[in-house]
Amino acid sequence: MLVEINPSKIYGKVKAPQSKSFGIRLVLYSLLKESKLDNLIPSDDVNVAINVVKQLGVSVEGTYFKREKELVTPKFLYFGGSATTLRMSIPILSVLGVDTIIDGDETLRKRPLNAIIKALEGSVSFSSSLLPTKISGKLKENFVRIEGGESSQYISGFIYAFSLVGGGEIEIIPPISSKSYIYLTIELLNSLGGNIKMKGNKIYVEKGDFKPYIGKVPGDYALASFYASSSIVSGGEIVIEDVYELPNFDGDHSIVNFYKMMGAESYVKDNKWIVKSSEKLNGIEVNVDDYPDLAPSIASLAPFSSSPTIIKGIKRLKTKESNRVVTISETLSKFGVKVEYDEDKIVIYPSEVKAGHVICPNDHRIAMLASVLSFKSGGTIEKAECVNKSNPNFWKDLISLNGRIIIR
């Protein structure tokens, strides 16, 4: 798919894309208790999660999920490009007992499994440290010690796994990256009857009394941020509906404050994110280690600021769908933006954004970044269907917001 974008003023009302983080967690929750996800719009990654729970023994009828029998581990599981589903599923498989070959697409085959292999050493074996790999064995005790720097998703997976078997303890070896996603998992499960506490670098999972989840999948701030930044750079005003109220911990919702710090009017009221453009934007310095998915969103506004933007905590960007340190920088450069990076940071300078052409490196957020830049000066994006990984309505929504977009 080729998308051609002409300069446009983005404004109006739009529903936030459904949260991939919440969507996958709520689908996996059906392993613990039945779920009815009223407004579920499956993206590629959510479809992977649905397929996994079905193969483990959950009955799925439309948006209704119910576990009707003992869970089983199949001989083969395919995870597409969904790293979240993969990393949360391996701990679950390990407590059930597993003799399964797991695989994924070319992007997932590049993702390391080192932390989970080390954590399960002595109980569960892996035939390879990269996909495809065969996993065999069963966790011998309801305790695990795992490095926290590779991915918080393994830790979320163990929270689910120990909730499934009546309790357990997780000791995290610092540093702990993306801690906000661990808080998200704990808060979600505790709201549904879980009994989970985090003290320092330890998580204690006690037997829970889980209740069915019947409700909506909340909106995703990180995905919605590209609508917001498109409006900001083009001089518009936008209301993004169906977002969750801001919790008392940092996370993807922190983008609301980051855009405010950069000079835009940005706030949440009554489950709506209201964003208005500003005559002047300014650069910020931000560490994204706890919310790496916000790096492309921040980068989308940075060239239009009056001072440089410095993005730190970028280590985990290198093992996303693409090496985002490189692909963010290359994408900005193709639109005439001055950008520099090293091992520790990306520096984006105020620049005159020009029309650009990007071939999506099979990374949804890079295509979304390119779209924001294009609304200012025009641009074309090849392989634009990559947005389906997280938000299949992306281009349709932007057209509804006055985006002058031609899809070929």
Curated annotation (Swiss-Prot):
Residues annotated to bind phosphoenolpyruvate: 20, 111, 153, 324, 365, 389
Catalytic class of the enzyme: transferase
This entry carries the following GO cellular component terms, namely: cytoplasm
Q: Which SUPFAM superfamilies match?
A: EPT/RTPC-like (SSF55205)
Q: What is its EC number?
A: 2.5.1.19
Catalyses which reaction? 3-phosphoshikimate + phosphoenolpyruvate = 5-O-(1-carboxyvinyl)-3-phosphoshikimate + phosphate
Keywords from the named record: Amino-acid biosynthesis, Aromatic amino acid biosynthesis, Cytoplasm, Transferase
Q: Which domain of life is it from?
A: Archaea
Q: In which pathway does it act?
A: Metabolic intermediate biosynthesis; chorismate biosynthesis
Q: Which PANTHER family match?
A: AROM/DEHYDROQUINATE SYNTHASE (PTHR21090), PENTAFUNCTIONAL AROM POLYPEPTIDE (PTHR21090:SF5)
What the protein does?
Answer: Catalyzes the transfer of the enolpyruvyl moiety of phosphoenolpyruvate (PEP) to the 5-hydroxyl of shikimate-3-phosphate (S3P) to produce enolpyruvyl shikimate-3-phosphate and inorganic phosphate.
* Assembly information from the UniProt record: Monomer.
Protein name as it appears in the record: 3-phosphoshikimate 1-carboxyvinyltransferase
| UniProt organism field | Sulfurisphaera tokodaii (strain DSM 16993 / JCM 10545 / NBRC 100140 / 7) (Sulfolobus tokodaii)
Q: What is the lineage of its organism?
A: Archaea, Thermoproteota, Thermoprotei, Sulfolobales, Sulfolobaceae
